Protein backbone atom coordinates (compact mmCIF):
# COMPACT_ATOMS: atom_id res chain seq x y z
CA UNK A 1 0.00 0.00 0.00
CA UNK A 2 1.54 3.34 -0.98
CA UNK A 3 2.04 5.77 1.90
CA UNK A 4 1.50 9.49 1.39
CA UNK A 5 3.26 11.41 4.14
CA UNK A 6 1.87 14.75 5.26
CA UNK A 7 4.77 17.21 5.18
CA UNK A 8 3.71 19.89 7.64
CA UNK A 9 6.95 21.42 8.91
CA UNK A 10 7.04 25.18 9.38
CA UNK A 11 9.59 26.72 7.04
CA UNK A 12 11.03 25.29 3.85
CA UNK A 13 14.21 23.77 5.29
CA UNK A 14 12.30 22.07 8.12
CA UNK A 15 9.81 20.70 5.57
CA UNK A 16 12.69 19.38 3.45
CA UNK A 17 14.11 17.54 6.47
CA UNK A 18 10.68 16.12 7.24
CA UNK A 19 10.39 14.92 3.63
CA UNK A 20 13.82 13.26 3.88
CA UNK A 21 12.65 11.39 6.99
CA UNK A 22 9.49 10.35 5.12
CA UNK A 23 11.60 8.90 2.31
CA UNK A 24 13.73 7.01 4.84
CA UNK A 25 10.54 5.62 6.41
CA UNK A 26 9.30 4.34 3.03
CA UNK A 27 6.81 7.00 1.93
CA UNK A 28 5.84 6.91 -1.74
CA UNK A 29 4.86 10.58 -1.92
CA UNK A 30 4.39 13.67 0.20
CA UNK A 31 1.42 15.98 0.61
CA UNK A 32 3.21 19.30 1.13
CA UNK A 33 1.24 21.64 3.36
CA UNK A 34 1.80 25.39 3.19
CA UNK A 35 3.78 26.89 6.05
CA UNK A 36 1.25 27.42 8.83
CA UNK A 37 2.27 31.05 9.27
CA UNK A 38 0.87 31.67 5.81
CA UNK A 39 -2.63 30.88 7.07
CA UNK A 40 -2.66 34.08 9.07
CA UNK A 41 -0.08 36.31 7.42
CA UNK A 42 0.05 35.18 3.80
CA UNK A 43 3.25 34.61 1.85
CA UNK A 44 5.65 36.46 -0.40
CA UNK A 45 5.30 36.01 -4.14
CA UNK A 46 7.33 32.98 -5.19
CA UNK A 47 7.58 31.46 -1.70
CA UNK A 48 5.23 28.52 -2.44
CA UNK A 49 7.11 27.68 -5.64
CA UNK A 50 10.39 27.80 -3.72
CA UNK A 51 9.00 25.55 -0.98
CA UNK A 52 8.07 22.81 -3.48
CA UNK A 53 11.35 23.14 -5.37
CA UNK A 54 13.56 22.91 -2.29
CA UNK A 55 11.62 20.10 -0.63
CA UNK A 56 11.76 17.97 -3.79
CA UNK A 57 15.41 18.76 -4.58
CA UNK A 58 16.56 17.96 -1.04
CA UNK A 59 14.43 14.84 -0.53
CA UNK A 60 13.55 13.36 -3.92
CA UNK A 61 10.06 12.69 -2.53
CA UNK A 62 7.35 13.03 -5.22
CA UNK A 63 4.98 15.78 -4.09
CA UNK A 64 1.29 16.58 -4.11
CA UNK A 65 0.38 20.26 -4.38
CA UNK A 66 -2.05 21.15 -1.59
CA UNK A 67 -4.52 23.93 -2.44
CA UNK A 68 -5.97 25.35 0.77
CA UNK A 69 -9.42 26.99 1.06
CA UNK A 70 -9.63 30.43 -0.44
CA UNK A 71 -10.82 31.88 2.87
CA UNK A 72 -7.26 31.42 4.16
CA UNK A 73 -4.22 33.49 3.27
CA UNK A 74 -2.45 30.24 2.34
CA UNK A 75 -4.54 29.65 -0.78
CA UNK A 76 -2.71 29.79 -4.11
CA UNK A 77 -3.89 31.73 -7.13
CA UNK A 78 -4.08 30.02 -10.50
CA UNK A 79 -0.66 31.27 -11.63
CA UNK A 80 0.98 29.87 -8.50
CA UNK A 81 -0.73 26.49 -8.92
CA UNK A 82 0.37 26.32 -12.55
CA UNK A 83 3.94 27.25 -11.59
CA UNK A 84 4.13 24.63 -8.83
CA UNK A 85 2.50 21.90 -10.91
CA UNK A 86 5.07 22.45 -13.69
CA UNK A 87 7.97 21.77 -11.32
CA UNK A 88 9.86 18.48 -11.31
CA UNK A 89 8.54 16.08 -8.70
CA UNK A 90 5.01 17.50 -8.48
CA UNK A 91 2.66 14.86 -9.86
CA UNK A 92 -0.73 15.65 -8.31
CA UNK A 93 -2.83 18.33 -6.67
CA UNK A 94 -5.13 17.95 -3.67
CA UNK A 95 -7.56 20.79 -4.25
CA UNK A 96 -9.61 22.05 -1.32
CA UNK A 97 -10.32 25.61 -2.48
CA UNK A 98 -13.92 25.29 -1.21
CA UNK A 99 -15.10 27.95 -3.61
CA UNK A 100 -17.00 26.39 -6.49
CA UNK A 101 -16.67 29.52 -8.64
CA UNK A 102 -12.90 29.11 -8.46
CA UNK A 103 -13.16 25.33 -8.93
CA UNK A 104 -15.28 25.71 -12.08
CA UNK A 105 -12.93 28.36 -13.47
CA UNK A 106 -9.52 27.00 -12.47
CA UNK A 107 -9.81 23.23 -12.81
CA UNK A 108 -10.48 23.34 -16.59
CA UNK A 109 -7.43 25.59 -17.05
CA UNK A 110 -5.25 23.32 -14.94
CA UNK A 111 -6.51 20.27 -16.89
CA UNK A 112 -5.69 22.01 -20.18
CA UNK A 113 -2.27 23.32 -19.12
CA UNK A 114 -1.18 20.31 -17.01
CA UNK A 115 -2.92 17.27 -18.57
CA UNK A 116 -0.66 14.78 -16.74
CA UNK A 117 -1.31 16.27 -13.30
CA UNK A 118 -3.56 14.08 -11.17
CA UNK A 119 -6.34 16.14 -9.60
CA UNK A 120 -7.63 14.96 -6.24
CA UNK A 121 -10.58 16.56 -4.48
CA UNK A 122 -10.55 17.03 -0.73
CA UNK A 123 -14.01 18.62 -0.71
CA UNK A 124 -15.72 16.20 1.68
CA UNK A 125 -18.75 18.48 1.75
CA UNK A 126 -18.83 18.99 -2.06
CA UNK A 127 -18.26 15.44 -3.27
CA UNK A 128 -20.95 15.51 -5.95
CA UNK A 129 -19.88 18.81 -7.46
CA UNK A 130 -16.22 17.84 -7.74
CA UNK A 131 -16.61 14.15 -8.70
CA UNK A 132 -16.82 14.88 -12.43
CA UNK A 133 -13.49 16.70 -12.72
CA UNK A 134 -11.08 14.54 -10.75
CA UNK A 135 -8.80 11.54 -10.80
CA UNK A 136 -9.48 10.66 -7.18
CA UNK A 137 -10.46 11.74 -3.69
CA UNK A 138 -7.97 12.41 -0.90
CA UNK A 139 -10.48 12.92 1.89
CA UNK A 140 -11.17 12.06 5.49
CA UNK A 141 -14.46 10.66 4.22
CA UNK A 142 -12.49 7.65 3.00
CA UNK A 143 -12.35 6.49 6.62
CA UNK A 144 -16.16 6.42 6.80
CA UNK A 145 -17.46 5.10 3.50
CA UNK A 146 -14.65 4.04 1.15
CA UNK A 147 -16.83 1.78 -1.00
CA UNK A 148 -19.37 4.52 -1.67
CA UNK A 149 -16.58 6.96 -2.49
CA UNK A 150 -15.26 4.52 -5.07
CA UNK A 151 -18.76 4.23 -6.57
CA UNK A 152 -19.02 8.02 -6.70
CA UNK A 153 -15.59 8.32 -8.31
CA UNK A 154 -16.48 5.72 -10.95
CA UNK A 155 -19.76 7.50 -11.71
CA UNK A 156 -17.97 10.85 -11.94
CA UNK A 157 -15.33 9.51 -14.30
CA UNK A 158 -18.11 8.03 -16.45
CA UNK A 159 -19.93 11.41 -16.33
CA UNK A 160 -22.98 9.49 -15.04
CA UNK A 161 -24.82 12.17 -13.08
CA UNK A 162 -27.80 9.97 -12.21
CA UNK A 163 -25.61 7.32 -10.58
CA UNK A 164 -23.40 9.93 -8.91
CA UNK A 165 -26.44 11.73 -7.49
CA UNK A 166 -27.82 8.44 -6.15
CA UNK A 167 -24.54 7.72 -4.33
CA UNK A 168 -24.42 11.31 -3.10
CA UNK A 169 -27.93 10.99 -1.69
CA UNK A 170 -26.92 7.84 0.19
CA UNK A 171 -23.94 9.69 1.66
CA UNK A 172 -25.83 12.91 2.45
CA UNK A 173 -26.96 12.02 6.00
CA UNK A 174 -23.34 11.28 6.94
CA UNK A 175 -22.12 14.36 5.09
CA UNK A 176 -24.53 16.52 7.06
CA UNK A 177 -23.62 14.91 10.38
CA UNK A 178 -19.88 15.26 9.90
CA UNK A 179 -19.16 18.04 7.41
CA UNK A 180 -22.08 20.47 7.42
CA UNK A 181 -20.99 22.12 10.65
CA UNK A 182 -19.92 25.55 11.79
CA UNK A 183 -16.23 24.94 11.30
CA UNK A 184 -13.83 22.48 9.77
CA UNK A 185 -12.55 21.59 13.25
CA UNK A 186 -16.05 20.57 14.37
CA UNK A 187 -16.14 18.18 11.42
CA UNK A 188 -12.72 16.81 12.34
CA UNK A 189 -13.94 16.04 15.86
CA UNK A 190 -17.15 14.46 14.51
CA UNK A 191 -15.10 12.32 12.12
CA UNK A 192 -13.14 10.88 15.04
CA UNK A 193 -16.21 9.97 17.14
Segments (PLM) and residue ranges:
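Active-site pocket-lining/capping segments in soluble small-molecule metabolic enzymes
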Residues: 181-193
